[in-house]
Amino acid sequence: MKLVLLRHGESEWNKENLFTGWMDVDLSETGKAEAASAGITLKQKGYDFDVCYTSYLKRAIHTLNLALDEMDRVWLPVVKSWKLNERHYGTLQGLNKSETAERYGEEQVKIWRRSYDIAPPLLKEEDERNPRFQEQYRQEKCEILPLGESLKDTIARVVPYYNEVILKDMMAGKRVLIAAHGNSLRALMKYLEDMSPEDILNVNLPTGIPLVYELDEEGKFISKEYLGDAEYVKAKIEKVSAQGKVTIE
C-alpha cells in the first residue's frame, strides 16, 4: 500500500527565513504555485485518494486545498488534527534563522532545528504565542499543548496519531494523503524507516514535492520516492539544508 506525504508549499516566513513553528503563517505566492504543482503532478501520475489528513495550520490546509483543486478532488474528506502541526519552536518562533545562527552559532541552531531530543527555549505561560491563547486550540486541554518541542517530543504526538487513526484507514484499504510540515513529517519518516536519531539529523524535506511511501500489508517500509525531477528535488533539499546558516553579505 502507498502513503503520500506532502510538506506545505513555501510560507511567507519560509521566504523570510524565520522560525515558524505553530505561528499560523500563510503560503507565499511561490508556495501557492508549489502546492498547485504538487496536485498537477499527483494527477498526472495517476494518484487518487479516499481521505486526506492535515494540521490546524493554514499553510498546510491551503497547500492541501490547492493540490486537491488541481486534482478535481476538493470534495474529498479532510481530517484536521493539531497532532500533525509543525514542531513547536518555543521562543525561537518569529526569529530569523541566519541571525540566530550568527548570534548563537550555526552548530547550536542546527541542534535546535535538526536534533532529536533537544528542545529550543520554551515559551513562558503568559506569552501571547502560547497555543492556549489561540482560537484553533480552544477545545484542547491546555496542559497537553506544548510551549516548545524537540523532534522526540513531536514524534510522541505524531506517531500515536498515525498508528491509532491514519494507519487504520490505510489498513481498511483507504488511499491516504497527508499534507503537513517539515518536522511533523520528519517525525513520521523516522518512524516509518526506523531511522536512528543520528540519521534523522540530516534529513531535509523539500516544500511542495510529493513523497510516496510503499508499505507492506502490515504498514512496514519497503521503499520511498519523490515525485519530481531528481535534480530539482536535490536543489530543493539543499535549499532547506542551507537555512540556519550564517549569511555573508
Curated annotation (Swiss-Prot):
GO biological process, alphabetically ordered: gluconeogenesis; glycolytic process
Pfam families xrefs: His_Phos_1
Entries under InterPro entries matching the protein: His_Pase_superF_clade-1 (IPR013078), His_PPase_superfam (IPR029033), PG/BPGM_mutase_AS (IPR001345), Phosphogly_mut1 (IPR005952)
Coiled coil: none
Signal peptide extent: none
Domain of life: Bacteria
Binding positions for substrate per the UniProt entry: 7-14, 20-21, 59, 86-89, 97, 113-114, 182-183
Broad class of enzyme this protein falls into: isomerase
Pathway: Carbohydrate degradation; glycolysis; pyruvate from D-glyceraldehyde 3-phosphate: step 3/5
Site (Transition state stabilizer): H181
Residues annotated as catalytic: H8 (tele-phosphohistidine intermediate), E86 (proton donor/acceptor)
Keyword check for Isomerase: yes
Protein EC: 5.4.2.11
MF-aspect GO terms: phosphoglycerate mutase activity
Function: Catalyzes the interconversion of 2-phosphoglycerate and 3-phosphoglycerate.
Family of this protein: Belongs to the phosphoglycerate mutase family. BPG-dependent PGAM subfamily.
NCBIfam families the UniProt entry points to: pgm_1, PRK14115.1
Protein name (record): 2,3-bisphosphoglycerate-dependent phosphoglycerate mutase
Organism: Lachnoclostridium phytofermentans (strain ATCC 700394 / DSM 18823 / ISDg)
